[in-house]
Amino acid sequence: MEALKKIAGVTAAQYVTDGMTIGLGTGSTAYYFVEEIGRRIKEEGLQVVGVTTSSVTTKQAEGLGIPLTSIDDIDCIDLTVDGADEVDKAFNGIKGGGAALLMEKIVATPTKEYIWVVDESKLVDHLGAFKLPVEVVQYGADRLFRVFERAGYKPSFRMKGDKRLITDMQNFIIDLNLGCIENPCEFGRLLDQTVGVVEHGLFNGMVDKVIVAGQAGVTVLEANQST
């Protein structure tokens, strides 16, 4: 599985050219993309500036010598490469298994070309088998948990050891065990309107390409070619 993730990440790095501002994703597959960008800077003299999606990726990029800038200092990003936990046939996805969904969506939004790198196990007919992360402010989080519970969403707080995980943005994550999300766009809008929810892990209609690594090789799926 790690070999497939590496293939996907390295393949995505081929889309990066000199002069680009690039979004550096978070997670086990995006890790290999960031590593390959670091290698190209060192060995090929690649000239890029990165914008990171988590403190983990920031540390990785700094260690590789990738020049970084703040999302606040730019207006657009040429290319962002990130992982995904699930991708359906309509190119909707669930992200946030690494607890970086808020920063990931902030970086994805001003991106001209948004690419996901996944192994073939992440392709699904319907989203929801992977728990849906919902980032919530700490104030009122327990009340919101009960709201989700009453709605039948089977919520659980994301934990780190015996304490609730706190994101880079100082929020909690409530994971929803939905089983199947029949209408991701509608459910995303519902969460958007829920007071106390900062962001959720439904990335609907955002991705342009999905690079899929499988036993038979690498496939590049284009969102604008989907039916």
UniProtKB/Swiss-Prot annotation:
Its EC number is 5.3.1.6. It holds the Pfam family Rib_5-P_isom_A. It catalyses: aldehydo-D-ribose 5-phosphate = D-ribulose 5-phosphate. SUPFAM superfamilies: D-ribose-5-phosphate isomerase (RpiA), lid domain, NagB/RpiA/CoA transferase-like. InterPro entries: NagB/RpiA_transferase-like, Ribose-5P_isomerase, Ribose5P_isomerase_typA_subgr, Ribose5P_isomerase_type_A. Keywords: Isomerase. The keyword Glycoprotein does not apply. Substrate binds at T26, G27, S28, T29, D82, G83, A84, D85, K95, G96, G97, G98, K122. The keyword Isomerase applies. One of its GO terms (biological process) is pentose-phosphate shunt, non-oxidative branch. The active site is at E104 (proton acceptor). GO terms for molecular function: ribose-5-phosphate isomerase activity. It comes from the Bacteria. It is an enzyme of class 5 (isomerase). Pathway: Carbohydrate degradation; pentose phosphate pathway; D-ribose 5-phosphate from D-ribulose 5-phosphate (non-oxidative stage): step 1/1. Homodimer. Catalyzes the reversible conversion of ribose-5-phosphate to ribulose 5-phosphate. Belongs to the ribose 5-phosphate isomerase family. This is Ribose-5-phosphate isomerase A. It comes from Streptococcus equi subsp. equi (strain 4047). The lineage of its organism: Bacteria, Bacillati, Bacillota, Bacilli, Lactobacillales.
